[in-house]
């Protein structure tokens, strides 16, 4: 460390530290602050004065203590050993921190992000003399039931002069050498604020299926898309995200708990290892990475945690996998931006947030997408961000900025949550811009008439919502029979189609063929009942028909028995209403 790269603490304001004498320092350099060598990052430079955000508690830090720059940006180490891991916001493994310092994170602690002693069974897929580019696949390593592909760093490439034979290696061992003398290891570093390069971005065409009927049918997300889940406190943002993490069809899940309650991360840690992965039969944690940055951890690390999470997601995307990133919650991240901005005495914008809030959010969400990697693989990162507007006010800056950026908007409703309606997503206040993109996929893979059925369901729900307003004013007796049928069908759609039981092993997640069958059954009931009304049958006789109970039980029928059950109910609908008509 040269003298020019060493400065002294000039002033301290919470996580913001001003250091003078920082000659040769660069923007976003990582620095070590004070005698305890706290981790910090330079976020502004004026001459030789650096403004540093410190990722640890600055209590006890004094003016005049040394500040040393490492000359390197905030980076994460990418390689085998990340799956089944839980990290803090700057990729320090919490289990190793606990071994070193107990239940609370000691200041200035330095631990390795990856296990440096564990040996991995490496099988090369290249040989000496081959030419490799950035993010090329050098070989594979088995990690649980997952094939971990070993990549060259995105900014390295050339002709290989030596490749290690198949065998067991640690992440520090050299497994290949380039012509320019660069040694390649099982792991490499990458700065979190720099998006990993790709060959091209692809038009999304595959759906990201969540197992939730309301999302997969009415408001779908594409593989590589972005979605926002805004909602007031207690409306189920975290539960919805955890459910998507469990049942979504992504290969890898990165879950970032950004400024949320510690108990929520504890729930994930306790629950995920016990959950069986439907793809592999093993624990769900074996394809999950958790980044825990709870509300009592230093505020500056929140700002880094979402970048850490998306960089890990991009690394697995570059291996040709589909990755889902859950950010819970981006509002806490924005609050961290606001606090640091105010400490630096920057000019505030709306509600005290910095003027660059929208740009920061856009830079984060734009790192999602379906891509062709530099190695020619197809990969995708889908980002689902929770937003926690204070008091449920959807007009506040974070929600509005997110609304402009994301392609799907899943609005949570506190009223539905209070009525124990899960998932508590408001079907009249949500939307998805990906619906027309996925129509062709649904026609080919689910049913030729799927888009039309979905539109009919959406129309019925809207009609029911407007009729409910009339009912609340004058009561149901003022409605005509046709309108009462719309209300009854809307109730069935709400309670027996959109609502799911998260504790029921069958109903917690639903496949698209089952969703399609349920849609056809519900609409068949409506069509047959409407025809019966025209033939003079009373609405009370229709509503009391026992077939309605069979329709309500359909969602609890296991997948293996569902098609036979659906056929029997459809036949019964035919005979029941024909009998009534006669």
From Swiss-Prot:
Reaction catalyzed: ATP + H2O + 4 H(+)(in) = ADP + phosphate + 5 H(+)(out)
Ligand binding (ATP): 231-238
Cellular component annotations (GO), alphabetically ordered: proton-transporting ATP synthase complex
Alphabetized Pfam families for the sequence: ATP-synt_ab, ATP-synt_ab_N, ATP-synt_ab_Xtn, ATP-synt_VA_C
GO BP: any one term: proton motive force-driven plasma membrane ATP synthesis
Molecular function terms, GO-annotated: ATP binding; proton-transporting ATP synthase activity, rotational mechanism; proton-transporting ATPase activity, rotational mechanism
Keyword Cytoplasm attached: no
EC category: translocase
InterPro entries per UniProt: ATP-synt_VA_C, ATP-synth_a_Xtn, ATP_synth_asu-like_sf, ATPase_a/bsu_AS, ATPase_F1/V1/A1_a/bsu_N, ATPase_F1/V1/A1_a/bsu_N_sf, ATPase_F1/V1/A1_a/bsu_nucl-bd, ATPase_F1/V1_b/a_C
Enzyme Commission no: 7.1.2.2
Disulfide linkage: none
Record's function text: Produces ATP from ADP in the presence of a proton gradient across the membrane. The V-type alpha chain is a catalytic subunit.
Family classification: Belongs to the ATPase alpha/beta chains family.
Official protein name in the record: V-type ATP synthase alpha chain
Organism: Deinococcus geothermalis (strain DSM 11300 / CIP 105573 / AG-3a)
Annotated gene: atpA
